[in-house]
Amino acid sequence: VSVDCSEYPKPGCMMERLPLCGSDNKTYNDKCNFCNAVVESNGTLTLNHFGEC
């Protein structure tokens, strides 16, 4: 399971409300918020699964 974050980071996120569960067991509201967190973590954050944790 993966998400393409190549176009991130983005300065602002629209609220898509498509939850993603990260490897930190945190639920991200959408791909934008998740991908921005991946960039901030220098790629250490990964996707556990789609949906809430």
Swiss-Prot record:
Q: Give all residue intervals belonging to the Kazal-like domain.
A: 3-53
Record-linked InterPro entries: Bifunctional_prot_inhibitor (IPR051597), Kazal_dom (IPR002350), Kazal_dom_sf (IPR036058)
Which species does the entry assign this protein to? Turnix sylvaticus
Q: What is this protein called?
A: Ovomucoid
Q: What keywords would UniProt list here?
A: Disulfide bond, Glycoprotein, Protease inhibitor, Repeat, Secreted, Serine protease inhibitor
Alphabetized CDD domains for the sequence: KAZAL_FS (cd00104)
**Location in the cell:** Secreted
Q: Which cysteines are joined by disulfide bonds?
A: 5-35, 13-32, 21-53
Q: What is known of its domains?
A: Avian ovomucoid consists of three homologous, tandem Kazal family inhibitory domains.
The record's principal subcellular location, in a coarse class, is: secreted
Q: Which cellular components does GO assign to this protein?
A: extracellular region
User: What glycosylation sites does the entry record?
Assistant: 42
Q: Name one GO molecular function term.
A: serine-type endopeptidase inhibitor activity
Task: Cite the position(s) of the site with description Reactive bond 3.
Answer: 15-16
According to the lineage, what is the superkingdom?
Eukaryota
Pfam families in the cross-refs? Kazal_1
Give the matching Gene3D superfamilies: 3.30.60.30
